[in-house]
């Protein structure tokens, strides 16, 4: 029996990872955070001071892997769990640049497709429905206004030391949106057959339920 693949794409800060995890828990599917893979490559490149022209040759030594521990995705560089290290603003910006490099996308492409072929998955990223899983059973484009995304991120970081200002976060989101939408390789865009879910005025539970309804409607009709 064919495994069910759900693709969730959208801009930075739209809540893709959090909402996709909630949806996967409701449906019993494996959640795959592809952004974590790109962030890990960015961390590897940053830690080793690898210039762009040498990245392709260095990729086979990166040894990036996903492991599912107690139902939770963890990402590793070799035997080192770097799941926490890849969530800094610096690595976020580095990942936006790194993910535009064709060699990096090609390196991770096979990993993502293999996981999807072997499991019922909910996979989120920037080009899942358009490039990685073009034949996904259901495609969602999850978005929210830049201002709302910045506000959510600011609330997340407010209690942490050296928290950036709301305006700095908003500027960063606008910059990342531009980079992601205008890169030459696999730019961020909504797949023609994707369902748009705008969460600007929805909380997390409402967003997850909206997506579950779309999935159940589409999978039910297909069956």
Please provide the spans of the model-predicted regions.
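Residue-level signal for inorganic ion chemistry
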Residues: 35, 79, 108, 122, ...
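The conserved Walker
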Residues: 12
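Conserved lysine of the Walker
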Residues: 16
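Hydrophobic positions on the alpha1 helix immediately C-terminal to the Walker A/P-loop
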Residues: 19
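Small-molecule kinase domains that catalyze NTP-dependent phosphoryl transfer to phosphate-bearing small molecules
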Residues: 67-69, 112-118, 126, 131, ...
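Hydrophobic anchor at the beta1->P-loop junction of P-loop NTPases
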Residues: 8
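N-terminal phosphate/diphosphate-binding loop that engages ATP/GTP or pyrophosphate donors
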Residues: 25-89
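ATP-dependent NMP and nucleoside kinases share a basic, alpha-helical "lid"
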Residues: 83-86, 90-95, 99-160
């Amino acid at each position: 029996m064919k495994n069910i693949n759900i693709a969730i794409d959208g801009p930075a800060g739209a809540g893709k990872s959090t909402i996709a995890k909630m949806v996967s828990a409701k449906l019993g599917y494996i959640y795959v955070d592809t952004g974590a893979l790109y962030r890990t490559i960015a961390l590897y490149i940053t830690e080793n001071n690898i210039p762009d022209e040498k990245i392709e040759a260095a990729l086979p030594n990166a040894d990036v892997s996903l492991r599912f521990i107690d139902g939770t995705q963890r990402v590793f560089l070799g035997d080192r769990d770097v799941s926490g290290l890849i969530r800094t603003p610096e690595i976020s910006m580095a990942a936006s640049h790194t993910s535009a490099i064709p060699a990096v996308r090609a390196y991770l492409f096979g990993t993502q497709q293999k996981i999807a072929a072997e499991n019922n998955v909910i996979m989120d990223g920037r080009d899942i429905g358009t490039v990685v899983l073009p034949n996904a059973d259901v495609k969602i484009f999850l978005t929210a206004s830049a201002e709302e995304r910045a506000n959510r991120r600011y609330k997340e970081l407010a209690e942490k030391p050296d928290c950036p200002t709301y305006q700095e976060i908003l500027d960063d989101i606008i910059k990342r949106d531009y980079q992601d939408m205008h890169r030459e390789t696999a730019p961020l865009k909504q797949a023609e057959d994707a369902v748009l879910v705008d969460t600007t005025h929805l909380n997390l539970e409402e967003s997850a339920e909206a997506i579950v309804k779309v999935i159940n409607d589409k999978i039910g009709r297909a069956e």
